[in-house]
Amino acid sequence: MSDQSKQKELLWQSRFSEPFDREALQFSSSVHVDGLLYREDIQGSIAHATMLGEEGIISAGESEQIVEGLKAVEKEIESGELVPVWEDEDIHTVIENRLKELIGPAAGKLHSGRSRNDQVATDTRLYLRRNIDRLVGLLEAMQSTLLDKAERYKSTIMFGYTHLQRAQPMSAGHYYMAWHSMFGRDAERLADLRKRANISPLGAAAFAGSTLPLNPARSAELLEFDGVFANSIDAVSDRDLVIEFVSACSMIMMHLSRFSEDVILWTSAEFNYLSISDAFATGSSIMPQKKNADIAELVRGKTGRVYGNLMNLLTIMKGLPLSYNRDMQEDKPPLFDTAETTASSLSVFRRMIEKTWLNEERLAKLTAEDLSLATEIAEYLVKKQIPFRDAHRITGKIVAYAIEKSKTLPTISLDEYRTFSESFDEGIYDDLKPDASVNSKKTAGSCSFKSVEEQIARARKNS
């Protein structure tokens, strides 16, 4: 007997006179990927079967039989008793075929009024909803860790940077609160997407709806969707929600990647601002002294994967005519990979950050000796009614003088300061202390200790 004759009959096979080519079947099979959707597929099928029974499209007994059978199939998949193979074409076929083996002819009524198109669209939205909630939870955990770090280091002074050059002193707590804000917007983006994703496509069928007296609103209610599709073509033929999800994840990964860059730099011997627990570092196979921030490096590297997934999806969808096209099957690998990569990156990165600490003695020494207080000199002169551009020019000359004479700004004498401007008096030295500089900031959301405390309190109240 040939391989072709041994092949399982496919759900759509009856119209064709020849069996589907085996290599073509293996090429088009997606069960090795969409197997991840088995929970969502069974969840959607239970809702559909329940609605069919309630509307009298199938009998109440058949509906109950299908629902119980689907629950049994789910248990078999979870226990490993039912293992999909590529000949099954996709996870939906696996479930339906096994259901037929368990309950007999009633299984054939499950697909009444439903197409694979609205079935897959429903599964995808359920998957998006679950993973949105998962990622929002991880982002909130990250924010909680960052709040704890901000609280711990709110009175620690360190450099803020622009162009990777020391710029001005700031509260280290202010740094952590910046990340808190960024991850907060990431969570907001996902929460906003959830509203659009939480609409049921069930009832759209292939793309035109169904002649059967379906009740899409009831299916939506059973699946805890907020509403029903407005247009049946749109319900099955777009993947903008998948693209939006991967885009939102790309933003999360971008933030994690930037944060990783700081961790990598700050844990280097050249910076030595930050120490990381041995539990989240690796060594070298040849250099015994090495302690590498590999988790941060991997997160930074995995960001490229998620960016690639976004471009993958945009490219898949860019030329497709309405409504459904088989190309859309290829949305699953980038979607699933993005969800898992982003979730695992958030989880391990948060735990790593939890086990880091700032080297406060080094930060205090460096900020006291640095030229990063130059802006304070310029603003001191502005308070003396000198136009800012003139104050900036004068301060630039003072900085050049300090570099030439190997002095720090606080060690320049008053007589020396007065050679640059008669406006200087003893008060300049009050401004040339890192803590005074930080706490002199008056604008809302600034880096002063008081402002950081307010940011922390507001964030804790809203969390």
Curated annotation (Swiss-Prot):
Pathway: Amino-acid biosynthesis; L-arginine biosynthesis; L-arginine from L-ornithine and carbamoyl phosphate: step 3/3. Disulfide bonds: none annotated. It comes from the Bacteria. It catalyses: 2-(N(omega)-L-arginino)succinate = fumarate + L-arginine. Keywords: Amino-acid biosynthesis, Arginine biosynthesis, Cytoplasm, Lyase. Transmembrane segments: none annotated. GO terms for molecular function: argininosuccinate lyase activity. One of its GO terms (cellular component) is cytosol. GO terms for biological process: arginine biosynthetic process via ornithine; L-arginine biosynthetic process. Its EC number is 4.3.2.1. The keyword Lyase applies. InterPro entries: Arg_succ_lyase_C, Argininosuccinate_lyase, Fumarase/histidase_N, Fumarate_lyase_CS, Fumarate_lyase_fam, Fumarate_lyase_N, L-Aspartase-like. It is found in: Cytoplasm. Belongs to the lyase 1 family. Argininosuccinate lyase subfamily. HAMAP family: Arg_succ_lyase. This is Argininosuccinate lyase. The lineage of its organism: Bacteria, Pseudomonadati, Chlorobiota, Chlorobiia, Chlorobiales. The gene is argH.
